[in-house]
A protein has these predicted regions:
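Short, surface-exposed ligand- or partner-binding patches at beta-edge/loop junctions that are enriched
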Residues: 57-58
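Rhodanese-like catalytic fold shared by cysteine-dependent sulfurtransferases
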Residues: 2-15, 21-53, 62-96
């Protein structure tokens, strides 16, 4: 996965979701990332079509992997765990 492809997918209606806690999110997050904590992923209103590209990240990767599996169970077909903050930085994402 590369940043250009991810940005292309996001521009076409995809989502970038930070699944960390609100406290972690407020300390810094990827620009334009939507906060949906992994504990709320079961019932959260996901503002994307079932076939839209959805990218997830957390601090280290496991919470994003958990959230990805839940979203797949909910019928979302293009869900990708991008890993943790270090992975996001390595991909070239801007943090705010």
């Amino acid at each position: 996965m590369d940043l250009a492809q991810i940005k292309f997918d996001l521009a076409k209606g995809g989502l970038l979701i930070d699944v960390r806690t609100p406290e972690e999110y407020s300390e810094g997050h990827v620009k334009d990332a939507l906060l949906i904590p992994h504990t709320q992923i079961f019932t959260a209103d996901i503002p994307a079509k079932k076939d839209a590209s959805i990218y997830l990240y957390c601090k280290m990767g496991p919470r994003a992997e958990f959230a990805a599996s839940v979203l797949k169970e909910r019928g979302y077909t293009k869900v990708t765990n991008l890993g943790g903050l270090d992975d996001m930085e390595a991909l070239g994402f801007e943090f705010v």
